C-alpha cells in the first residue's frame, strides 16, 4: 500500500523570519531561564536572541547566554529548529535551540538590557507560569529536550564568509 502524503503546510510570512538561537540547559531537573521585560510585561524565556551579522549560530548562542545570564555556555547538541509565527505581531521566527552546560558564572557582570533576573525552574514550574512564557517555543524546546531529541552540532553548518562572498559575487 502506498504511503499517503499529508498536504503541505503553507506558512504565511510577512517577511523573512528572524533567525534566533536559544539555550536549553538543565541542572538537577531545573532549566536556566531569564525573566525579561517585553512590552511592559514580565515574561520567561530561555536565554535567547538574534544572530548578529557575520556570527555563526554557535557563537551567537554562547554570546546570548553570557549576555543574558552571566554564565559561560558550552553547546553540546542541537535540540531542534523551530519556525513560529507570532499571531499578535505577524512576525516569524526561526529558532535554533541548543543544549549544553554552563560554567564560569560572573556574578559581577550586569545582565543584558531588559533582563530582570535569571532563574532555575523545573518544567512543572514553567507549566504553572505558562501565561507568562514569551512564546510556546519555551516549553516546546524543553519538551523536545526531555524527550531525548538531540542532533550533533555538525548538523548545523556555517559557510565560510569569505567563500560565501566570492560565490555570491560570481552568482550575480
Where are the language model's segments positioned?
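Short, low-complexity, intrinsically disordered N-terminal peptides in bacterial proteins
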Residues: 1-15, 168-172
